[in-house]
Amino acid sequence: VIPSIGTELMGRCWISDVRTWNAPDPVDDGVSLLADTLTGLVPASGRIGIPMGLESHLRMPVADFHGLQKRIAPRQIVDGTDAVYRVREIKSEAEIAKIRASCAVADAAFDRVPEFAGQGVPLARVFRDFQVALLQEGADWVSYVAGGAGPGGYGDVISPADERPLQTGDVLMLDTGAVRDGYFCDFD
């Protein structure tokens, strides 16, 4: 169940039953379609597990979620975090190859850091050039670049890069979450 803008993309995957609605719809932004789908697939006494743990997100307004729960009752939405985590731990050979390809992109970009990071180069410029290197090495997109630099170490890695130029003795740290073919790498 997705907004209609994703129909073409989802049509290329292995899922054959893709249901869509015209979004955005301020009156019913897919909630009735999702409720109808769930009630058609899950028996009235059934439970629907969704991830509720770390790194999970509710991608709908909370009011819509509460409305969905009412519409699908007596079915219950329960915490399926453990089950989802167990499934995610198991990777096919194809997934492993995709993860390796994503990591290879980051590895190649890190190998290029000496091309653009050096004494006198502002940290903000290093960040931008690093993102460019990731894209040039094959990333489809760069979800984030974080890092820091400072004499003998760095103070934090969550502040935005600034225009302070790198100096001799600075330790530079870069962290990225580049994506290739839908697979992320987390590389420091």
Language-model segments: which ranges?
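Active-site pocket-lining segments that scaffold enzyme catalytic pockets across diverse folds
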Residues: C103-V113, L123, Q131
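A composition/biophysics-driven feature that prefers long, compositionally simple stretches
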Residues: V1-V105
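A broad detector of the eukaryotic-type serine/threonine protein kinase catalytic domain
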Residues: A23, G53, D82-Y85, D111-E115, ...
